[in-house]
């Protein structure tokens, strides 16, 4: 199940900035209809990596800009894990 942060994205914002309709984006992504575009935009589904990279190309912005809440959440978790790993390494070498 997705958290509220994971559902937040900027897909509609960047689609509109580019002046595209959902139908145009679906076509650029090689999809037959707009249903998955709508699901992605409203946070009902996360695009697979290949689709996320295609969106990055279509909208001309990094994937992190398209999904900023998810990016920040993941970055925070990784930084915490890095800090813990560094602390464990320092403690192990001091003993």
Q: What is each PLM-predicted segment?
A:
Residues 12, 23, 49, 53:
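Residues within the helices of the helix-turn-helix
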Residues 38-39, 50, 68:
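Base-recognition residues in the alpha-helical recognition helix of bacterial helix-turn-helix
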Residues 16, 30, 42-44, 71:
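Residue-level detection of the helix-turn-helix DNA-binding "recognition helix"
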Residues 19-39:
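Short alpha-helical DNA-recognition segment
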Residues 15, 26-27, 56:
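The alpha-helix within a helix-turn-helix
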Residues 43-57:
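Short, basic-rich loop-to-helix N-cap that marks the start of a DNA-contacting helix
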Residues 57, 64-95:
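Short, charged recognition helix plus adjacent turn
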Residues 1-17, 91-94:
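A short, Lys/Arg-rich alpha-helix, primarily the initiator
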């Amino acid at each position: 199940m997705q958290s509220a942060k994971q559902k937040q994205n900027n897909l509609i914002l960047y689609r509109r900035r580019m002046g595209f309709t959902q139908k145009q984006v679906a076509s650029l992504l090689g999809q037959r209809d707009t249903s998955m575009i709508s699901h992605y935009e409203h946070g009902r589904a996360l695009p697979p990596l290949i689709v996320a990279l295609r969106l990055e190309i279509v909208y001309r912005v990094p994937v992190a800009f398209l999904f900023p809440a998810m990016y920040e959440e993941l970055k925070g978790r990784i930084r915490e894990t890095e800090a813990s790993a560094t602390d464990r390494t320092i403690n192990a070498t001091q003993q």
